[in-house]
């Protein structure tokens, strides 16, 4: 299975100049990294998710590379146009050059109170425009401490089950247009990291749950996110249940981001 390493830039960098500098560093690092050469890039797909205001410019810079571009969110109100101040639709995001969008990140769930119903609508709109979805799930520190991880994840995965029920005509697209990113909330940006064994067991549960929804979902891509860095990437990449990484802070430094991608590329050999 092809690995994926996705850089979620969040509300960074601050200026267009900084964005271009990061892209310069990233492209230069890729060109000099043997394991991430064009011949080997098929083993690990790299994607970055810039701020919306930089999306079109980043896509323009990356159009002649193998790096894909994603949005960090999409409107749940409409797939195309409408009187929704401050929103950006899936159609508009595709027009800006993105081929994927992140949905359900814990920061969106926390700061914008995004519910399963809201995320279902966003998923429907995204996939109706052939905008792939990186769907984030994960438990809080309290839920982890009280051993509720799998229960929480099952509740979050209900969005996928409901999508299949409501949009059966789109189910065939899911194996190639849906990626799950398991990000324990307590590990995001904290430096706290679950063991590889814990992540592997959780990923196995996620894969089995998805396979139970539909036969076509028996081999889904599941990434890990949460304080992934250059130092721990090899240990995660070595586990066959972990298909890649959703990277936050470490994606803002080209060298660290490429070290993570290289780890998964080598593990896919």
UniProtKB/Swiss-Prot annotation:
InterPro entries named among the record's database cross-references: Aldolase_TIM, TIM_sf, TrioseP_Isoase_bac/euk, Triosephosphate_isomerase, Triosephosphate_isomerase_AS
Assembly, per entry: Homodimer.
Pathway note: Carbohydrate biosynthesis; gluconeogenesis; Carbohydrate degradation; glycolysis; D-glyceraldehyde 3-phosphate from glycerone phosphate: step 1/1
Cited NCBIfam families: tim (TIGR00419)
Top-level taxonomic group: Bacteria
Localization terms from the record: Cytoplasm
Functional note: Involved in the gluconeogenesis. Catalyzes stereospecifically the conversion of dihydroxyacetone phosphate (DHAP) to D-glyceraldehyde-3-phosphate (G3P).
Designated name of the protein: Triosephosphate isomerase
Keywords in alphabetical order: Cytoplasm, Gluconeogenesis, Glycolysis, Isomerase
A GO biological-process term: glyceraldehyde-3-phosphate biosynthetic process
UniProt GO MF annotations: triose-phosphate isomerase activity
């Amino acid at each position: 299975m092809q690995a994926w390493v996705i850089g979620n830039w969040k509300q960074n960098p601050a200026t267009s100049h900084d964005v271009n500098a990061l892209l310069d560093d990233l492209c230069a690092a890729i060109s000099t990294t043997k394991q991430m050469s064009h011949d080997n890039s098929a083993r690990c797909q790299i994607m970055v998710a810039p701020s919306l205001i930089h999306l079109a410019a980043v896509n323009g810079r990356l159009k002649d590379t193998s790096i894909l571009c994603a949005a960090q969110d999409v409107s749940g109100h409409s797939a195309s146009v409408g009187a929704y101040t401050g929103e950006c639709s899936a159609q508009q995001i595709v027009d800006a050059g993105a081929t994927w969008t992140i949905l359900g990140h814990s920061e969106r769930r926390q700061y914008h109170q995004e519910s399963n119903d809201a995320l279902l609508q966003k998923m429907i709109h995204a996939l109706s425009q052939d905008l792939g979805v990186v769907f984030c799930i994960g438990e809080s520190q309290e839920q982890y401490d009280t051993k509720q991880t799998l229960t929480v994840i099952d509740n979050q995965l209900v969005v996928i089950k409901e999508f299949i029920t409501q949009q059966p005509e789109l189910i065939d697209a899911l194996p190639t247009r849906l990626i799950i990113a398991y990000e324990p909330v307590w590990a995001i940006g904290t430096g706290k990291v679950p063991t590889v064994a814990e992540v592997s067991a959780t990923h196995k549960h996620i894969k089995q749950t998805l396979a139970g929804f539909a036969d076509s979902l028996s081999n889904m891509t599941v990434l890990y996110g949460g304080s992934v860095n250059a130092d721990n990437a090899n240990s995660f990449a070595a586990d066959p249940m972990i298909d890649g990484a959703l990277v936050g802070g470490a994606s803002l430094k080209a060298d660290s981001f490429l070290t993570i991608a290289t780890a998964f590329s080598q593990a896919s050999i």
